[in-house]
């Protein structure tokens, strides 16, 4: 079976455009709020409303996919995101922006659930790792290019919103030329998110997504602060963050390929061990370039491999519900990780950022080793 089919390629093309729009807005909204001289707590509330929307969107998208299919769910998700974008220019103010960012958060989460579920349902045990690797490469590449766009174009609110909205609507176009079949609508069986979270044989995958959220959320959110406290200029901080993200992009396809060939368990063990090594190396400050590179290459690839593990433990009609559970787990981890790490850094030492990352990774490594005898390699239901 050919891995990158026409529907998959068109889906990833649409995702790239949507991710560009997401990256641009996520950066500029904070700047617009700062320019409006809003208090810090209000800026935090607007940011939190977006992530709250992510949680809400994650919860009901599975039902939507079951009712109207992948294509229409994708169209609806994109339109909701576009509405959240346009609303920022129609109504200005704390409460209105908090509402519009909540709506945008719902749309973004719906997009992620639809795309990830469609890829999982399109794949088999032999190529799901590569499909998810391609997904993450497109996502991080879109995020990276979005940051470049922010630095090259006008940042004025009414200048940005028209072309960003146009980019969102353009992201719909590729899927107008293909149809992604949802086999879940052809069965009477249904699964809930809670049932997937309780599924014992998939627990390693769920836990892996939580750990991935903690690791990536902490690195994304607090690494610039850590570097700033080391006395680095903004240009240097940007360079080192680019090294981190670039390593994550470059590591996706090899990790996905290795996971398909040698099994998820072995690759997960190696990834987590490398994250621990990278964290320890950052504490020594001996060689930041290789330390950051291996930390990014291993840390940014945990999520797709853990997701592939969990999805191989369920039946085909349960894939959408499982994907919702995994994305929810990742989101929870990405919210809790930075909050806890920031508290440790403020009260004790900046080095606790990497100590925390190494600690949670070590706990997950123990889980992987302990369960090795029970589930040596997951077998997919295809």
From Swiss-Prot:
Taxonomic source organism: Salmonella paratyphi A (strain AKU_12601)
Which ranges form a coiled coil? none
Q: Which UniProt keywords apply?
A: Cell inner membrane, Cell membrane, Membrane, Transmembrane, Transmembrane helix, Transport
Do you know which Pfam families this protein is assigned to?
Answer: MFS_1
Descriptive protein name: Uncharacterized MFS-type transporter YcaD
- One cellular component term from this protein's GO annotations in UniProt: plasma membrane
TM ranges are 14-34, 45-65, 75-95, 102-122, 131-151, 157-177, 204-224, 231-251, 270-290, 291-311, 325-345, 349-369
PANTHER family, per this entry?
Answer: TRANSPORTER MFS SUPERFAMILY
Q: What family does this chain come from, according to its entry?
A: Belongs to the major facilitator superfamily. YcaD (TC 2.A.1.26) family.
Keyword Plastid carried by entry: no
Where in the cell is the protein located? Cell inner membrane
List the Gene Ontology MF annotations in alphabetical order: transmembrane transporter activity
């Amino acid at each position: 079976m050919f891995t990158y089919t026409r529907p998959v390629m068109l889906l990833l093309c649409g995702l790239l455009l949507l991710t560009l729009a997401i990256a641009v807005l996520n950066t500029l909204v904070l700047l617009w709020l700062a320019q409006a001289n809003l208090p810090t707590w209000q800026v935090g509330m607007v940011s939190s409303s977006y992530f709250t929307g992510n949680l809400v969107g994650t919860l009901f998208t599975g039902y939507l996919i079951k009712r109207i299919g992948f294509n229409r769910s994708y169209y609806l998700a994109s339109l909701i995101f576009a509405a959240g974008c346009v609303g920022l220019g129609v109504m200005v103010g704390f409460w209105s922006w908090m509402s519009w960012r909540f709506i945008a958060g719902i749309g973004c989460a719906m997009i992620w659930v639809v795309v990830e579920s469609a890829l999982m349902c399109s794949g088999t045990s032999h190529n799901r790792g590569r499909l998810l690797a391609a997904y993450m490469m497109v996502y991080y590449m879109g995020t990276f290019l979005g940051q470049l766009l922010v630095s090259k174009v006008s940042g004025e609110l009414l200048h940005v919103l028209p072309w960003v909205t146009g980019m969102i609507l353009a992201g719909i176009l590729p899927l107008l030329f293909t149809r992604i079949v949802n086999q879940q609508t052809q069965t009477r069986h249904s699964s809930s998110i809670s049932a997937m979270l309780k599924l014992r044989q998939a627990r390693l995958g769920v836990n892996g997504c939580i750990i991935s959220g903690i690791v990536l959320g902490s690195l994304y959110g607090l690494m610039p602060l850590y570097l700033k406290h080391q006395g680095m200029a903004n240009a240097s901080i940007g360079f080192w963050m680019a090294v981190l993200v670039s390593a994550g992009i470059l590591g996706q396809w090899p990790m996905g390929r290795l996971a398909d060939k040698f099994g998820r368990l072995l690759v997960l063990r190696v990834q987590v061990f490398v994250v621990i090594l990278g964290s320890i190396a950052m504490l020594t400050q001996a060689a930041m370039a290789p330390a950051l590179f291996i930390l990014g290459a291993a840390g940014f690839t945990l999520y797709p491999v853990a997701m592939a593990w969990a999805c191989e433990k369920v039946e085909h009609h349960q894939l959408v519900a499982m994907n919702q559970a995994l994305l929810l787990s990742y989101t929870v981890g990405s919210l809790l990780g930075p909050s806890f790490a920031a508290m440790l850094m403020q009260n004790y030492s900046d080095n606790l950022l990497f100590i925390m990352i190494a600690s949670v990774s070590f706990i997950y490594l123990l889980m992987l080793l302990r369960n090795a005898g029970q589930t040596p390699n997951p077998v997919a239901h295809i």
